[in-house]
């Protein structure tokens, strides 16, 4: 009896091992298939910034630049089951943001009619993180999109399908929308990567998205302006006001100077490219009881409002303002004083999509 039981377990183990060995693993990094960043072919890791910027930016900017926020991988396969395995180097979660958002991946698929679908995966967060997707159907004509973790650094990642199934990495074409922003644009506090507003926007517009956002450190700094300025973009988004509060160390005049420098630098190389400057998405809501923060956000947003009005009046017809009112966050939209939840992320993405649609129609 014991021998029969042992042989049964042994048979199951061998069958499971054989099945696991039948997967073929595809490495997007080796295939230069990482999207969502600048000069991806030059990067041999999952960072968003190239090595030469390490000596030019402040330490926290470099550290956050190693996070894979906004990075994504497109591929086609006729496999009905997909397994993702990878390793991250940082903490799995934060007090105000779950593991699935900080360290998880997220899988979508665009069908042959251009409609997006979402795939639910079973996940296991151990030393090697795994997401397994089963019974997807054989969607050979679909383009899958895998979003990488928002607030963690990926050391390695592989996509596994059965050995007899086709698999091919894809790359988006067209001029990208480049986003320079703060923690909100980096993805705090979406519950999963596909719900970060930049990733939602990427599914709603016909352009690739490049995410250059740094939690607490979106400050319109010269090295990052130089970095994004090398891209021939469809639109530049400067969403840094949440990290540029007016304090004793930063006056309204100094904030205006930062905005002026950023726009002037971009205009030297891209005189006609649309630039969007965004007010603080939070604040301005009397139903949220935080008078100090509301006033802080109002003051810095007022500087942005005045700047865009002045520059547009002087002749720059391709400079735009996205207002707090157009974004429309409310008492159901945030996890704290500023960071949007999934509802807030959708509101931000929708506001950008509407404005960008108008801009690109011109």
Question: Predicted segment positions?
Answer:
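Short helix-loop-beta junction
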Residues: 198-211, 309
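Oxyanion-hole/transition-state-stabilizing segment in secreted/luminal serine hydrolases
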Residues: 193, 201, 219-260, 265, ...
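Substrate-gating cap/lid alpha-helix
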Residues: 283-322
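Histidine-centered active-site loop/cap adjacent to the catalytic His
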Residues: 336-362
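The substrate-binding groove and active-site-proximal loops of carbohydrate-active enzymes
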Residues: 241-255, 290-298, 336-343
